[in-house]
Amino acid sequence: MTRLDLRAGAAPAPAFVSAAARYGVIERPDLAFTPAIARETAHLYEKVKDFIPAFEWAAYAPYVHAINRLKKERNAVILAHNYQTPDIFHCVADIVGDSLQLARDATKVDAEIIVQCGVHFMAETSKLLNPEKTVLIPDAKAGCSLSESITGADVRLLKERYPGVPVVTYVNTSADVKAETDICCTSSNVLAVVESLESDTVLCIPDEYLAMNVARQTNKKILTWKGHCEVHERFTAAELLAYKEANPGIEIIGHPECHPDVIEVCDFSGSTSGMINYVKDKRPQRVLLVTECSMASNIQAEVQGVDFVKPCNLCPHMKRITLPKILDSLLNMTEEVLVDPAIADRARLAVERMVNLKQ
């Protein structure tokens, strides 16, 4: 039911029209594995053959083929985070990267439709930066433990407790939280963001470990929140030291969402893109990536001769995004990502300040 504003001179709010109604629904294609599909996807299989056995490719290829055709038909672009599985990352994604890269690239997209292969806050960020575009996420239940650790109301209480202290919010948060924020950050630019502020004290939320790690690199006083990434908080310094002892010469590369004790053991720490660039530049013989499991597979497909040693931890939220769900998203124009207009402008400003920050 459309609610009318009966105040003098007020026009009724326009009725919402779903993406499915705007673009129409397309009938599901035949997903049989044919010789033609095998030929047309052969160059893509070359990228993932070390992770997907040939007999299993018959189940993947029809989806890959259908998605890549539908992208053109829909004038859509697929943005995929570095934690997506190799079949998505290498076979259907148009743009890949960490949260900062995806946020920046989202502002340069010409396509009418963005399909975000990642978790919900990433899709929200793309919508904030592209309010006129249609943004879809294949599974709206793809959440994030960090995003769920804090609300906009929590930030307002923090601002009351620490009046005048600027708030730097990790991009792994909802639009509601971003709207209460001075500027956003990612794991790749958090230090630059903190240093860009004139205040000697900064609220860096909600990732406690990220804040603790940046506090070691700045003279500013860092206040934080007790949010944690469920993937990275499970790693311990003791297990990494044990791996180092058992594997002499191995290089350990960690994500700054890990506890500072873990980062102390690492030979390098950085965002997911920072990790990728480190491996490409240094070409270490053996590497232990202290992050989500798909990272090693995605790097290994591009960098030959590097032996990636476990352990790793799976992100159950990232793994909710699959080829069948991406196909359904493009066929049915679901699930559309919307941001409450009451908070969108303020949330967008915090993200744009981050994107436009010169580093």
Curated annotation (Swiss-Prot):
One cellular component term from this protein's GO annotations in UniProt: cytosol
Official protein name in the record: Quinolinate synthase
Functional summary from the UniProt entry: Catalyzes the condensation of iminoaspartate with dihydroxyacetone phosphate to form quinolinate.
Binding site for [4Fe-4S] cluster: 144, 229, 315
Top-level lineage group: Bacteria
Localization (cell): Cytoplasm
One annotated GO molecular function: quinolinate synthetase A activity
Family of this protein: Belongs to the quinolinate synthase family. Type 2 subfamily.
InterPro entries from the UniProt entry: NadA, NadA_sf, Quinolinate_synth_type2
A Pfam family this chain is assigned to: NadA
Keyword GTP-binding: no
GO biological process, one term: 'de novo' NAD biosynthetic process from L-aspartate
Gene transcribed to yield this protein: nadA
Top-level enzyme category: transferase
Co-factor: note: Binds 1 [4Fe-4S] cluster per subunit.
Pathway(s) of this molecule: Cofactor biosynthesis; NAD(+) biosynthesis; quinolinate from iminoaspartate: step 1/1
Primary location recorded for the protein, binned into one broad class: cytoplasm
The protein's Enzyme Commission number: 2.5.1.72
Xref: SUPFAM superfamilies: NadA-like (SSF142754)
Source organism of this protein record: Sinorhizobium fredii (strain NBRC 101917 / NGR234)
Positions that bind iminosuccinate: 81, 99, 170-172, 187, 255-257, 272
Record's catalysed reaction(s): iminosuccinate + dihydroxyacetone phosphate = quinolinate + phosphate + 2 H2O + H(+)
